[in-house]
């Protein structure tokens, strides 16, 4: 008889982040704060953010370099569009805080049991989510997988990291996890249905899957993001490059999460759509804080985010630098009110 996941009779997280305070749903327009006279640019949070990412070692990994930045490469082909060096790791740690704020401080929206036993964080990046989750649930074994060894070596005793390509067959035994966490895998997955099928396979009966994704399209509710702006060009750049890379950047726009999760066999499917401001223009204090980190994430290492896709499109280094300068200037201009759409889908494996 297969082991079942612990019952979630006393869930740790709310069904809706709104129960914790103001978070902009996808249907709500973001209310703009008054702009003080003469204050058009916002300095954000500065350059003080520090991140410690000591590498683990593995002889099977190789890296390629584009304009001095390193990218994961498997057999000579880059497997991930974002840089895997320290600058980008710092940006991804900022993104973790930004994404957590977007869920009212929650690490998950699935109603997990207090005595959850084993969790898998797929595509864990710097490992920061897995570490925070392990701290929150000290009795739970947390495994984070990624193709690059950029996780810290000093971690809670109940967390470990493994080198694994989630686009290949997963090596974990069937029905071995209570919860599978999938976050910000946009541009990395050639077959989303297969990804959710793999998650279904390794989950215990009654276990939960959760998929959090962000749109690449930068929008505004008041048309402050102009069609010819660098902000408006951001999404189309990634979408055009995806035709060469082979992995979609329109996960949210094409609604790939919920149908794929349902097709895999999950039940009790829930979905949460929201907006993430990319500078501190909102009037609401919590949304303004989200916007501060949105700006910091977007400008901390813009090069590491866009360089690979720009290189795929044949841009020269000079063209990349000009675009990045324009993008950063527009993000910091408080007259612009940019945001991206977020979607979280969570569901349960039948018992």
UniProtKB/Swiss-Prot annotation:
Q: Where is the composition biased (Low complexity)?
A: 1-22
Mention any Pfam family matching this sequence. Methyltransf_23
Which Enzyme Commission numbers does its entry carry?
Answer: 2.1.1.-
In its keyword annotation, does this UniProt entry include Protein biosynthesis? no
Q: What induces it?
A: Expression is negaticely regulated by the global nitrogen regulator areA.
* One GO BP: methylation
What are the protein's UniProt keywords?
Methyltransferase, S-adenosyl-L-methionine, Transferase
Knockout or disruption consequences: Does not alter the amount of produced r-N-DMAT.
Q: Where is this region: Disordered?
A: 1-53
Q: Which family does it belong to?
A: Belongs to the methyltransferase superfamily. LaeA methyltransferase family.
The identity of this protein, by name, is Methyltransferase FFUJ_09178
Per the UniProt record, the lineage of the source organism begins with:
Eukaryota, Fungi, Dikarya, Ascomycota, Pezizomycotina
